[in-house]
Amino acid sequence: MSKFGLIGDPIATSLSPVLFNAGYSGELEYDLIEGNDFDASWKSFLDEYDGINVTAPFKEKAFRKAELFTPYCRKIGASNLIVKTPDGLLADNSDFTGIICSIAEAYFPGIVAEFCGTFGERAHIKVHQFFRQMSERIFPQKPQALIVGCGGAGRAAAVAAAELGFDTALMNRTAEKAQKIADELPEYNFIVDPVTDFRAALKECELVIYTLPMKLDAIDSLTTEDFAGENPSAGPAKVILEANYKTPSFSGAAMDRINAAGCRYVSGREWLLYQAVTGYLRLTGRQPDCGAMSEAIRRV
């Protein structure tokens, strides 16, 4: 029987096994390959598994071990999925497709389920194309995105936002890391904003993708007006997508202000769901049960 797993640290509370087992009715094996030693985890994969998911802090290291790459994975320079193929180790990045689907679903509720039913394994491609086609109709001018955090997930978020047609700014506690992404991907014309400009940058943009594992101090002082933006009556409401679903930075009073401003907050659980749906198909070659996965993530 085919065998799959997850490497990273820490992963003991990961929801990936729950989603995988729901997607395939427990018919395929999925393990947590726990440990903070990348080389040991990688050896376990090579010795025992057909494919693995990869989470922090191993995404860049796994990318460098691969021999084949999907186009967007190569651009992103980090992988959350490695699968053995007859031609070698293939790296993919379903964070990218998960972000595409999460953003599209926020603006067009129901689109992902509809397109999954219609297009199957090509659903995320069709979602991507649909959003690009509709962008000019829903935004009065070219929309802006702010990516906070420039690790593996942040890099995937930056490429996804730019591919969806957003003018995209990068922000990281270490500005050099953000600048490195901008320099390596000049085709996207990324700009780099300092963390000290977080409030102003958030206020100006239509989309925020927050990938830092911890909360910036400035979040607690954000007002309803900051979340609403400079011209809240023009175009759709601001969307805030956060990667961290375990201890989200936008919670409590910040969430109250997000709701009061009419913004749409997208939990990292939704990102996790959509990256799993698209990633598991690549991992196993079998279409997972999207409905069962969605129900499973709502129950936990």
Predicted regions and their residues:
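Rossmann-fold NAD(P)-binding glycine/threonine-rich loop
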Residues: 241-282, 286
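NAD(P)-binding Rossmann-fold cofactor-contacting core
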Residues: 166-185
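Glycine-rich adenosine-cofactor-binding loop
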Residues: 8, 93-95, 103, 143-162, ...
